[in-house]
Amino acid sequence: MLLPQPKSTAKKPKGEAKSLVARERKSQPQDSALMEVPAKREMPKKEVKKIRSVHKVESVTKTKSAKLRRKKSYSLSSDNESKYKKSISPAASEEASIEKKKEEMTSKLPEKSVAMKTANSPKTFNMELAKKFFEMRMKESQRTSRMATKSDSSLETMPESSHNSGQSSKSRKSQRTRGKSTPLDRNIFKENGEPVWVVPDRKPGELVMNEHGEMVKYPELMAALEEDGLEMEDGKGWFQKMSSYLMGELDQGRIDNKAASKDINPFASMETLEERTDLYFSRETVIYNTTDSIFNLCHNAIERFSQQNNEDTIRKSVPPSREPGSKMMTVSKDEEEKTAIVTSIRFDARAYRISYDRRRPVHSIQKFRKKYQKQLKKSQEEKKDDTKTAKNEGD
């Protein structure tokens, strides 16, 4: 900002002030702008006369107040003009000093600076400072991006398919570590060839010494039965029990199932329930129930076995098998006279095909009906022709 020297009090014509403003606007360089503040004009002083009358004093006070108002309004208008408009240029004698100062200011400005002018406030833009600022911002952004990549690399992510496809077959085979698999023969079967679940290591049917000194085939089963208070008997002894069952000697262990099912009460006392279990699982009841089940299931087999042993019973003779063609048809004489000798036989071997379209079911059914009606007409006409020919031949 440059402030010009105060003007002289002498008045100058208006035309000269306008011409000076136009010259200064042309002479100002484009690279810089100057703000000029106008100097206050001093009006010539007037002689004040002393007024003695009252009426004249009032008129003087009114004129003074009016002058003060004018001065205030003028000062406000001058301030507004200095803010928003260019002021009037100084006198012509001071133009040389102002131009020198302008040249000095332009020489001090850097070469790369550019003047950015606006209507209200002119400013200069420094390119070097701007470059430095943007370089610093770029470096900071690069640092932040690197830090973000480092933090992301620590995360566990699934590899893409392209990375896996690049591996060689040898590296894949080396990564696969399989344990040694034992053969099935060792896992499932023993050395003697028997499966693992066969616990006793002995031949089937071989006798083994029991704890009581008895030779038994199944010692494990005997031990399990002894725990439950049961005995294992030989199967051949059941033949005698079957005969005693038929004679009615085992009726002591018989229980009426209908009466027992009516009296069952699951919420009864423990004493009654224990009595019921003793009754059902006693030795006599178990023998009776087993013989009863054997008799009912094997009744037909027992009858066949008894028939084989008895020599008196003769087996029913089964008639020999005959061929179906060997049977002779007995035909009466009347039927032979009525029936004519068959000379020709006709076989109808026409194939009848039906096509059905699921997309158009109604259309396919209509086609089928048309075909069926046509074939019926043909068959009826053929039958009529056959009957006519048969009548002609008979005549």
UniProtKB/Swiss-Prot annotation:
Residues 13-28, 97-111, 378-395 have a biased composition (Basic and acidic residues). Residues 64-73, 170-179, 365-377 have a biased composition (Basic residues). Residues 1-121, 136-187, 308-335, 365-395 are annotated as: Disordered. Residues 144-164 have a biased composition (Polar residues). This is Uncharacterized protein C09F5.7. It comes from Caenorhabditis elegans.
